[in-house]
């Protein structure tokens, strides 16, 4: 039988191993652990090169969100869905599409089960942020079980947004969504739904955020609120080789076009054709 956990801010998991150890300490069963591990493997592929606006690896944010939900709720599909909560909006699927397409939903379902997939879809569909969070708060008493679960995932996401002063390290914290009014709604929503541990973590995260001052040398400006991708050096080198090859091909095409034009002109005027490339590889008239 899984147990709930008291989760200090400094013990929120940031890696898969830390998350697994947390779940083992909470006595999660093997089936539940396997479901979470399957979700992590898919998340690792979808977010391998994505970073947060503050340059925190996105996979660490997903793990932290899952860690918070696991401390509050012992349902494996909720923790698995927390690992994949941004899959349909920010995951790198490589299909050129957007949102929860049937093909993407099928992949998530195969990796983490239908209950997990439904939660990820519901998370994606729930309006959240400036104004919307207050709207959820006004109808908190009328939320059904699934909506309450998705709100828990949203609140866990908020914990990691604010934890470690994360919003101080980029200009994402300047958005209205992270203003005092919305922060108050988030805190009150956690309390009204009885998510005591999440409410405590939010309180601590807000306090740390308020007390932290970050120098300009560590602050990332002009970022997309969803973060971005960082290509590995090996990929950049391969791209450089390909670009150079394409440039060489372009030069060859232009040389060929000039020779053809010269030959056509020579036929018309009776002059000899234009310059040719020698058999030694030297270029003339380029």
Task: Kindly label every feature range from the protein language model.
Residues 2-276:
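Active-site helical microenvironments for divalent-metal-assisted chemistry
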């Amino acid at each position: 039988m899984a147990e709930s956990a008291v989760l200090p801010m400094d013990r929120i998991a940031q890696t898969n191993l830390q998350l697994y150890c947390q779940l083992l300490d909470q006595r999660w069963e093997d089936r539940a652990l396997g479901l979470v591990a399957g979700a992590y493997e898919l998340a690792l592929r979808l977010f391998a090169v994505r970073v947060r606006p503050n340059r925190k690896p996105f996979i660490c944010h997903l793990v932290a969100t899952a860690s918070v939900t696991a401390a509050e709720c012992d349902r494996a599909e909720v923790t698995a869905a927390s690992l994949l909560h941004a899959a349909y909006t920010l995951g790198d699927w490589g299909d050129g599409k957007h949102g929860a397409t049937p093909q993407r939903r099928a992949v998530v379902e195969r990796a983490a089960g239908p209950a997990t997939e439904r939660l990820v879809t519901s998370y994606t569909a729930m309006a959240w942020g400036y104004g919307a969070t207050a709207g959820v708060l006004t109808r908190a008493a009328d939320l059904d079980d699934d909506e309450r679960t998705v709100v828990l995932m949203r609140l866990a996401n908020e914990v990691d947004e604010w934890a470690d002063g994360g919003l101080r390290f980029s200009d994402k914290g300047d958005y209205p969504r992270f203003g005092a009014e919305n922060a108050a709604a988030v805190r009150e929503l956690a309390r009204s739904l009885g998510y005591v541990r999440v409410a405590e973590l939010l309180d601590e995260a807000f306090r740390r955020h308020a007390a932290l001052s970050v120098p300009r040398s560590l602050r990332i400006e002009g970022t997309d609120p969803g973060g971005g991708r960082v290509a590995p050096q090996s990929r950049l080198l391969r791209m450089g080789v390909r670009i150079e090859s394409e440039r060489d091909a372009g030069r060859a095409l232009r040389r060929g076009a000039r020779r053809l034009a010269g030959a056509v002109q020579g036929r018309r005027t009776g002059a000899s054709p234009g310059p040719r490339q020698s058999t030694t590889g030297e270029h003339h008239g380029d």
